[in-house]
Amino acid sequence: MTTVYVPAPDGTPLATDLCLPDTPGPHPAVVIRTPYGRTAHRAELRGWAAHGFAALAQDVRGRHGSPGPWHPYRDHEESDGAATVAWVREQAWSGGGPVVAVGSSYAAHCALVTALGPPGDGRPDAVIAAVPALGLADTAREPAGPERLSARAGWWAAHGDRPDSAPDALARALADDPRLLEHLPVTRLPDRLGRALPSWPGLWDACPRGRIVRRGSASRLPLLAVGGTHDPFAEDTLALWRGWGGPARLLLGPWGHRLTADRPAIASDRVNLGALYVRWARAALAGRLDPERRGVITLDGSGRWHGVGERVADGPSTRTTTWPFDAPTGLRLLHGAEFTADPARPVRSDDLAVPDGTTPADRCLLLSPPLPRPLDLAGPATARFHAAADTPAADWAVRVTALDPAGRAEPLAFGIVRRTDPPGETAEITVPLGTLGRRLPAGTRLRTEIAGHHFPAHARNPHTGENPVTATRLAPSRRAVSARGSALHLTVVARRRYVEPVPEICR
């Protein structure tokens, strides 16, 4: 393992760890560009090198060993990445050979923008993007607008406007002030953290979403998109895979943002991602991947994987089931057909407990009968209901929880949208709940909550029409949900198409 300094286009030396195979070259290469510290990837580099790849991990500009200003998601990631790939091809151990851009989270953004750059020696030959944090706007907000407060506060406190990282910065601040994220306005958070974060306010002005997904439609490079059904960026992973113009493969496992670092309970749900990446990279560089889109999605809780084609929910292997509100076979209203969404007392994202119905309703609560048999879910979920709010702006948050026969609760699906319907007028509200990959055992009941907030995961809508990140005044919002014509829609496996994930992805 050696450390070299790769010159960026403006001459900035980018600190890069390099690990070469023991065998004579030339070697194909793997490039990882990360803001989280290149030294954390040394075991990964050795793994690639053991399989015949020259492996590089680089600190992005302004982070750890690389000097310069640190501006997340700016255009320099593309140009610095291209300069690094071109430098790799100039080395004797490369011989101008193929390069794979690899990355997880922000590093996936770096890999993708490098892969989507102009043709030439600076563009890699394939890309592996895991749990991709695609861009500033993509990470800051949900597709329908609500701000991802706690996740962005945690990331910016840990990594923003500094050359190093303090992963527990937000946790320490919350220990000192448990109500830290409640203080208004949201843009003044750095004052309460006690350090300068000049880029924090601009985060919320970033637009538009989906830039990398749109650019990806013109690419002809092979793509491996890896995500988790519990990852907040799962839908971005799917959108990237669906829209990619070249041979595209999807692996959607039973994981969160840390992927297999959080070990699944069932051994057969586990995948050796390192071995998969090597096998896929070899197939991609050799031109052995079929041109069509292909992927696999977990059936979490079963140890099985379901094969998918052009779109997760297309084809005869799945169908949509409808769970009507207030129907014997659907979802029965427990309470809260009328409720008050009060941002001073918001429904919390970090608490699955629900009120017993003896207090004034702060959400609409529905419950299904027990499942008579196991149910495999593999595809998108949606809540569609008729409702009204008496305020000019309103967020609608829907949380679906699986209750086992003993009553233990486990999150199943979530979605939130922002609406500006005329006050008091009933409207049809559609809330996408993400893509599910799950086996529900017999006896499971589905509990559905419809609320006006999901705090602290999401910033509170003030209900005044003001921007939630600059607002300083909060107002309650009276809500009414109509059961008629309202339902939960789930994609279920109609015809089992079990596959082994690694062979399916590498062909």
Language-model segments: which ranges?
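N-terminal cap/lid segment of alpha/beta-hydrolase-fold proteins
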Residues: 1-25, 371
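Glycine/threonine-rich phosphate-binding loop and adjacent beta-strand/alpha-helix elements that clamp
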Residues: 5, 288-507
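Gly/Ser-rich "nucleophile elbow"/oxyanion-hole loop immediately N-terminal to the catalytic nucleophile
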Residues: 23-24, 69-77, 86-100
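Short beta-strand element of the alpha/beta-hydrolase
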Residues: 26-35
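Conserved alpha/beta-hydrolase
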Residues: 49-65
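Short beta-strand/loop motif that positions the catalytic acidic residue
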Residues: 219, 225-227
